[in-house]
């Protein structure tokens, strides 16, 4: 298998703490760059776990169309500002951040007080502007998740009248682009490829971490296929017919024929179906007359047995 290497040739951090990285992966066999690029991009854009603000509580507010006295932004603007916060929670549980500010004040993300499990990445992002003589009290809920989660107004846990839910975007990767370049021709004339991948994150994780997490997800996805064992299906035994379940007594055979069959451990029609005419004649004290009697009794219920073993 062709060995390739991964080089990060570029890494930048924007003013809002978003990060971008460019990676070169190669050399690869023809077609492998497309396979890797598509698979990694799909996981990067929708399969990684991230953190987001999922709900907000504002003192004195019970719906999103309200205004807060002394605050320049209305509640909808505050909700939007909180939705755009970039946070990184290391806890699997709900984390709650709080803020109490007296004006005049320019409230920013860095003013929020969380536990040590939560990091606010873009601390300079504005939240609200409080005028002199007024105050603002906020409570933010932060959770971890995957992909996009719309507001669920029927959830009893989050349906408190003063808890304003937010559509949560948990995706830490905001953009992925890749291109494929042909490299030198290998021995035998086959061209090699190189995958150039650009990954942009919101700053809650680095591009290197995003690439590693997506690769590990793909490994977990494909690993069971490497050890798959095909189990041969055993055909199910056919269900015996109702006629086969008829006990020997119900065939109304003569006493002689009945006793001979019983001594031969024949107890039902199902047992008789394993015999041929020749087999019946080999039963001790079982002559052709008794054999003919059995054949006729079986024919009355629609069952026939072969004349000889070879024709079975």
UniProtKB/Swiss-Prot annotation:
Catalyzed chemical reaction(s): RNA(n) + a ribonucleoside 5'-triphosphate = RNA(n+1) + diphosphate
Residue numbers spanned by region Alpha C-terminal domain (alpha-CTD): 239-312
GO molecular function, one term: DNA-directed RNA polymerase activity
Residue segments, region Alpha N-terminal domain (alpha-NTD): 1-229
Any one GO cellular component localisation term in the record: cytoplasm
Transcription as UniProt keyword: yes
GO biological process, one term: DNA-templated transcription
EC assignment: 2.7.7.6
Protein purpose: DNA-dependent RNA polymerase catalyzes the transcription of DNA into RNA using the four ribonucleoside triphosphates as substrates.
Complexes and interactors: In cyanobacteria the RNAP catalytic core is composed of 2 alpha, 1 beta, 1 beta', 1 gamma and 1 omega subunit. When a sigma factor is associated with the core the holoenzyme is formed, which can initiate transcription.
Protein name (Swiss-Prot/TrEMBL): DNA-directed RNA polymerase subunit alpha
Source species: Synechococcus sp. (strain CC9605)
């Amino acid at each position: 298998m062709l060995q390739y290497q991964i080089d990060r040739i570029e890494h930048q951090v924007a003013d809002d703490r978003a990060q971008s990285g460019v990676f070169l992966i190669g050399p690869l066999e023809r077609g492998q760059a497309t396979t890797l690029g598509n698979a990694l991009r799909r996981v990067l854009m929708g399969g990684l776990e991230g953190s987001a603000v999922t709900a907000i509580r504002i003192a004195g507010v019970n719906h999103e169309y309200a205004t807060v006295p002394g605050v320049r932004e209305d509640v909808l603007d505050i909700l939007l500002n909180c939705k755009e916060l970039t946070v990184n929670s290391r806890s699997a549980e709900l984390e709650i951040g709080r803020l109490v500010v007296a004006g005049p004040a320019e409230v920013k993300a860095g003013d929020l007080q969380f536990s040590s499990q939560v990091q606010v990445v873009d601390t300079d992002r504005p939240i609200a502007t409080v005028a002199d003589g007024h105050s603002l009290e906020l409570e933010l809920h932060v959770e971890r998740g995957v992909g996009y989660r719309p507001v669920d107004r029927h959830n009893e846990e989050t349906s408190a009248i003063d808890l304003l839910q937010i559509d949560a975007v948990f995706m830490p990767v905001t953009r992925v682009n890749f291109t494929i370049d042909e490299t030198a021709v290998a021995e035998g004339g086959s061209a090699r490829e190189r995958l150039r991948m650009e990954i942009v994150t919101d700053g809650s994780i680095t591009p290197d971490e995003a690439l590693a997490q997506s690769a590990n997800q793909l490994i977990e996805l494909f690993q069971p296929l490497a050890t798959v064992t095909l189990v041969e299906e055993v055909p199910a035994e056919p269900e015996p017919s109702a006629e086969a379940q008829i006990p020997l007594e119900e065939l109304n055979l003569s006493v002689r024929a009945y006793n001979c069959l019983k001594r031969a451990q024949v107890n039902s029609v199902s047992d008789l179906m394993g015999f041929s005419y020749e087999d019946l004649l080999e039963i001790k004290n079982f002559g052709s007359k008794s054999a003919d009697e059995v054949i006729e009794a079986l024919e009355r219920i629609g069952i026939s047995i072969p004349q000889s073993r070879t024709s079975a």
